[in-house]
Amino acid sequence: MATPWGAVFFLLMIACAGSTVFYREQQTWFEGVFLSSMCPANVSASTFYGIMFDAGSTGTRIHVYTFVQKAAGQLPFLEGEIFDSVKPGLSAFADQPKQGAQTVHALLEVAKDSIPRSHWKRTPVVLKATAGLRLLPEQKAQALLLEVEEIFKMSPFLVPDDSVSIMDGSYEGILAWVTVNFLTGQLHGHSQETMGTLDLGGASTQITFLPQFSKTLEQTPRDYLTSFEMFNSTFKLYTHSYLGFGLKAARLATLGALETEGTDGHTFRSACLPRWLEAEWIFGGVKYQYGGNQEGEMGFEPCYAEVLRVVQGKLHQPEEIRGSSFYAFSYYYDRAADTHLIDYEKGGVLKVEDFERKAREVCDNLESFTSGSPFLCMDLSYITALLKDGFGFADGTLLQLTKKVNNIETGWPGGHLSPAAVSGHLQLRLSVPLETCTSELLFTGRRGLGHFLQLRWRKPGLKPIDWLY
């Protein structure tokens, strides 16, 4: 999906000062979870590392984390992050899995350059794929993952069981919500005055919030709800991931490309594009020819009618979100920054209606379009339709668009991420001292998000156990 949280991605570091226990309302939530052992061979070593790959729909990103423990028995802290990325994403190599895995192999050189050779054998390496691979036929997705796993096994790093897997979309939303509300201090105490999160990736989109009214819980599909405990409080979240509703997947749906068998010799046209435009676009390894309506309508109203068909009646609309405020990131942030609705570095606060206003401005001036993305009108119109007619937000709903919370990155643009280093003293609470092994330090990542998070998950009928995802 978005990633690209990856979106998502920010890479996030969150520290949980106690166990986090999840209770899912259905038995099958995600696959490929695993335990990781980040135990240094020499338990007195003060520095250790972790490698996370985020395989998003538009690119693959590597994050190399450095942790330091200043004294035995003390909590380790995050000292820094090294980031790099390649495009296109793994899904573009659906028919060439070995070639796709080579993009991961190239990024492993970043890890080798960043981590002392003496630490290689005890540094775990993990790859989590998101919506891009979820959209592929299972056989092709698994072929890619198997090739990546072989690359990992040939590397000098520690390869945990199930180190390569596809992340469940809803988990992306949960991680984003926990991260933002933890970093803003909203999870401390018992007020539960939290903010919801919206993440828009390339292939999927997530919405997550803490319902305040029992009516919302009663009217919500059971598999949209997740309960967990943190800081002696219980949180029952509304969270759902919509596969195929990411920004770039929505372009294909708007163009009608998803309903057409074969793309050779076919040009997909839209009222959302400049009339004179004739171009090609590659997404998911497929080349699409597209252009404007040479004789037909053009502008906001006909464009909005096209994107409305993509979302109308297809998303659940919890009534209480109309009066709530949300954090929004990934492509929400990008398109707002691209059109100067917010400052690119600082972000800002918008109302839902601001996206519509900018969409009208851009779409009704397509004749004078000269630079930037030819999809800008379509993207802004889709974001407007997704927020208003998809999720059911009110025009006046406030959205906090941000890349960082307390100087920790929470999201990044899918596809054009730049190297970043995150420094700080975010302490991680380990359930056991480092000298007895940090097996409960969970190494997790998402499209836009990556986290190290101590987490305990319980499926119905099972005892709480420690998962790594």
UniProtKB/Swiss-Prot annotation:
Range of residues in the leader sequence: 1-24
Disulfide bonds: C272-C303, C363-C377
InterPro entries assigned: GDA1_CD39_NTPase (IPR000407)
GO molecular function: ADP phosphatase activity; CDP phosphatase activity; GDP phosphatase activity; IDP phosphatase activity; UDP phosphatase activity
Pfam families: GDA1_CD39
Keywords associated with the record: Calcium, Disulfide bond, Endoplasmic reticulum, Glycoprotein, Hydrolase, Magnesium, Proto-oncogene, Secreted, Signal
E.C. number: 3.6.1.6
UniProt-annotated catalytic positions: E172
Gene3D superfamilies: 3.30.420.40, Exopolyphosphatase. Domain 2
Tissue and organ expression note: Expressed in fetal cells and most adult tissues.
Pathway: Protein modification; protein glycosylation
Carbohydrate-modified residues: N232
Cofactor requirement: Ca(2+); Mg(2+)
Similarity field: Belongs to the GDA1/CD39 NTPase family.
Name of the protein in its database record: Ectonucleoside triphosphate diphosphohydrolase 5
Lineage: Eukaryota, Metazoa, Chordata, Craniata, Vertebrata
